[in-house]
Structures are given as C-alpha cells and as structure tokens.
C-alpha cells in the first residue's frame, strides 16, 4: 500500500487528508513558534518520537523541545500520505533550520529530511500523531555573514553523511545524537523502515478485529 498511487479520493478520505495535513503542519507550526500546550494536543497519549537528539513519548518530546529553548524553524515542502481505515502514514519533505555559534562564528544549519508521521483516528474521528521519526538526507553548515572558518573534515569523520552537520551542531549545543537512524546513506535500512511502515499501515489491530 505504501508508495502505491492512491485511489481517487472520496468525500470521506478527502476530509481525512485535509485533517491530517492540518494536524501535522500545525504540529510543526507549534514547534517553530513555541506553542507548547497546543503542540501537546497533536500527539496520542501512547505516542512515540525518535529523532536525532530525542527518543521518547510525544509528551516528553514537547517538554524537551521547550527545555531546549532554541528557535529552529522548518521549511515545509510537499507532503504525501496513505490511508487504511483509521490509520495513515504521512511523509513530509522539510528542511530543519537553526543557528549555532561554532568557533566564534554564527553558522546556519540546514538539514533536509523526510519527516515521517504515523497517525491514528480515534472513535470521535479525530486524528492524532502516534509516531514521529525522520529519514535524513543531507545537510550543510554555512556562515550567516560571509567569512572564513576552519572546520577540518576530520571533525566530521565520526558522523553519518546524511546528517553529519546536524549531528555536529547538536553536539556543539551539548546534545547526544543517535547515529543509527534511517538516512539515505544507508538505503537498505531506509527500505527496511518503509517495509515496517507498510506493515503497520496494513495490519489490523485488536479494535478492528473485534468489529468483524
């Protein structure tokens, strides 16, 4: 089902699509604008988030983002999604952005990523995020004001190619980084993750089994 062309939308699925798009864009909007209480309403109670600097529940992710206290806006591009009854997977193409001082130079971090959302609709037909993760693609660090800075390649040798600059910048801020997340430098792992998403999307949960 994942990556197959969607069937023509019905009125119901079109409404689901718009509600999901509103939800995930609102979640990122809240993150970018420090709207922490509103951001919490986007996640299911048993949700899970696993990204470069964080692994835990949705509630903990919001609290940790608040504690980070750093402006890190997202440039959002296209989003594709697939449905199966009350479950959906949405893939949002985005660029993570923030500024960090490195060796007394203000640097701009741009990290291209696919943000992966697993979503579920409750009995009141309200969608919530049940899982959030990323597939990392490429990134860069550039001086905010044109200047020269010496960052030897050796300082990046321990990092993954798909999110080396992001990892470096987060380490500079004092955050540990998970180096075993999906990234396009490990295509087999990305494909494995896609298969896991497809399995989750297409399998029936206990609630569905009880209805049949």
What name fits each language-model region?
Residues 1-29, 33, 41:
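Short, low-complexity N-terminal intrinsically disordered segments enriched in polar/charged residues
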Residues 12, 69, 105-107:
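Outer-membrane beta-barrel proteins
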Residues 74-76, 109-115:
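Short, surface-exposed coil-to-beta transition loops
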Residues 89, 113-165, 174-176:
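Short beta-strand edge/turn micro-motifs at domain boundaries
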Residues 97-109, 138-142:
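Short, cysteine-centered beta-strand-loop-beta hairpins and adjacent loop/turn segments enriched
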Residues 151-212:
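A hydrophobic membrane-anchoring alpha-helix module
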């Amino acid at each position: 089902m994942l990556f197959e062309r969607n069937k023509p939308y019905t009125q119901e699925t079109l409404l689901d699509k718009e509600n999901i798009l509103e939800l995930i864009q609102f979640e990122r909007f809240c993150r970018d604008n420090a709207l922490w209480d509103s951001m919490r309403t986007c996640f299911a109670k048993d949700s899970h988030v696993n990204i470069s600097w964080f692994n835990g529940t949705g509630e903990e992710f919001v609290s940790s983002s608040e504690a980070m206290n750093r402006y890190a806006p997202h440039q959002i591009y296209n989003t594709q999604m697939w449905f199966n009854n009350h479950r959906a997977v949405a893939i949002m193409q985005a660029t993570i952005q923030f500024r960090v001082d490195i060796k007394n130079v203000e640097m701009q971090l741009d990290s291209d990523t696919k943000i992966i959302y697993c979503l579920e609709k409750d009995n009141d037909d309200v969608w919530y995020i049940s899982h959030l993760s990323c597939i990392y693609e490429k990134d860069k660090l550039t001086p905010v004001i044109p200047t020269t800075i010496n960052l030897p390649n050796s300082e990046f040798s321990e990092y993954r190619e798909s999110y080396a600059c992001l990892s470096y910048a987060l380490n500079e801020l004092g955050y540990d980084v998970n180096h075993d997340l999906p990234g396009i430098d490990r295509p087999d792992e990305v494909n494995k993750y896609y298969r896991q998403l497809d399995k989750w999307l297409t399998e029936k949960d206990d609630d569905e089994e009880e209805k049949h």
